[in-house]
Amino acid sequence: MVQTEIQKNFSHMNDMQKQAVFCTEGPLLILAGAGSGKTTVLVNRIAYILQCELCKPWQILAITFTNKAAGELKERICAAVPEGGADIWAATFHSTCARILRRYGDRIGYTSHFTVYGTDDQKKLVKDILKQLNIAEKTLPVKSILSEISKAKDKMLTPEEMRKEAEFDSRKAQIAKVYEIYQTKLKTADAMDFDDMLCNTVKLFETAPDILDYYRNQFKYIMVDEYQDTNKVQYKFVSLLASKYGNICVVGDDDQSIYKFRGATIENILSFENTFKNAKMIRLEQNYRSTQNILNAANEVISNNTMRKGKTLWTENGQGEKIKVHTAENERDEANFIAQTILDGVADGRKYSDYAILYRMNAQSNAIEQALSRSGVPHRVIGGHRFYDREEIRDMVAYLQVINNPHDDVRLSRIINVPKRGIGATTVSHAADIAAGLGESIYDVIKEAENYPQLSRASAKLKAFVALIDGLIEAEQSGEYSLAELYNLVIEHTSYEQYLKTEKDNPEVRIENIEELSSNIVKFEEDYGDESDLSAFLEEISLQTDIDNYDADADTCVMMTLHSAKGLEFPVVFIAGMEEGMFPSVATMMNPDELNEERRLAYVCLLYTSPSPRDYAAS
C-alpha cells in the first residue's frame, strides 16, 4: 500500500497532528501544548512508520518520563499495531539504560546483577562516609551533598573535575571528597544510583564504540516525550543514539518546563533547531481537555515570560465556567472551605475522585489533610508514605537485593541483624572498616570472619548469616523456585513473621504488607512470564515513582504538590495558597529566571482540569 493510501487511515486527526505523524524523516520538534493529543500523535506516528514498512518494530525507541506513561504508550501501540507492537522499545530513560547496562555493563566494570540505589540507600551511604571523614552532618547536610553530586553527574563531572572546579571553595572541596568515596563505595558494592545509570550508559557508548554502533544501527527512529524535562546527560544519550540515521522526534512544550530543580535544562528544547541540522518544528495548539476560559487564563499567564517558542492554546469545547477565586482568612479557613466544597459537590452527584488539591509546598498539606479527615472526606496524599518505603517491605526487599547482589553493603548492613542474630553495630562497623581497607565488600570479609581478630568473637554468628544468604542464593540460582516461592523461602528461613509478632507494633498490618508484596511478586511473574527473574523485579520496583502507583479508579480525592501532578487531569482542581510569597514563592520573586519557572508552574497547574473545569485559587 502506498503512503498516500495509508495516510487516509489517519483522517480522524486534525491537520497539525497529521503533519506530525507523516513527517517521519530527519529531526522533528513537536511543540505540543497541554491537552493537544501528543500521546495520540506519538502512537499514530509509530503506527504510520510501521504501516509504511519504514523499519522493523524493534528499530523504534520511544522514551517517556514515567513507567506509567511508558506502560500506557506500549498498550496503545499494541492496540494500534497488533502485529509487532510489543517489540517496540517503549520505556523511561532509566529503564532503557538499565536494559543496556544489564547486557553490557561488564565493559565498564559492573555485573549484570548490579544494584540500583534509591534515595534512602544514598543517604545511608553518605552518612557512613561523613562518619569516616569525621564531618558533622550539621556542617554538611546529607541532602545538600546528594544534590551537589547529582548536579555534577548531570554535567558529567567526575569527582576530580568537581574538586578542580571548587578551587578555593572549601565546602565544595569537601563535597568532592565525599563524592569520590561515594563513587568508590558504589563500585565496590556493584551498585549505581539513578544518575549513574544515565552517565554510565553514555560512558559505555563513548568508551565502547562497537556497542554504540550496535544501538545506533538498531534504532532507526527515536522519539522522546516531555523533552523540556531532559537534562544534559539525557540529551547526550539520545543525540549519540540518533547520530547515524538522524530520525529523532522530540515532543515537548517549553512552557511546561518546571523541573529545573531536578537538573532539567530548558535550553535542550529551546535550542533543538540549532542543535540538530535541518530540524523542523510543528505546533499542536488545539486543546481537547480544557475550556476556553481556562486556556485564556493560562495563555495570559505565560505570555509574560521571555525566551519561549510561543504558541496560543485554543479549543472547540466552549467557554466553560470561569475560574473561581476564594479569599480565605487563614490556612485553616482555606482548608475548611476546600473540605466543605467537596462535600457539597459529592452531595450534588460528583465523585470524590473528581477532586484534586494542589499546593506549592508539602508543608501546606497538613491543615488540608486535617480538615478532610474531620469532614470524613476520603483522600490520598500522593508523595506520602510509599508502600516500598515501609520498614518491613524495605527489610524484605533488602534480603532479595542481597540474594541478587551480596556485595551490596547498604542492604546487607540493614538485614545482617534483622531479625536479631546477636550481630551488633560494633561488629558491623569493624567489618565495614576492614572491607574499606581491603577494597572489598562486607560480605567478602564476613565470609572469612575467623581470619580477623576484630570479628573473632562474632565469627560463628557471622558465618551462620553467610550460610543463610548462600543457601538462598543457591536456591535462586538453581532454577527450581519461582520468584514468589523464593520470597516465601526468605520469610520462612529468617522467621520474619515471628519477628514481627514479637518485636514490632501493629504486627497484623505489617504481616498484611509482606503478604501484599508476595501478591505484587505473583502479578509481576504473570505480567512478565519468562523475563520475570529476580534482577528484573528489583529493577522494576527501584524505578517506580508514586505517580506510577496512582489509581485513578479509587474514589478518593487526591492531594499533591503542583510538580507531582504533572501529566494528570481532574474535573475539579483546587490550587491552595495562591498568594504572593507562597506561590510565587519569596525565593523566586527577585530572580527573573526563577520567576519565569514559577509562571510556567502556574501555567501548567491551570491546565490540569478536564473536562468541566472549576478551579479554586485560595489566597
Regions found by a protein language model. Name each.
Residues N14, I63, A90, T115-T119, ...:
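Conserved phosphate/pyrophosphate-binding and hydrolysis machinery centered on Walker-type P-loop NTPases
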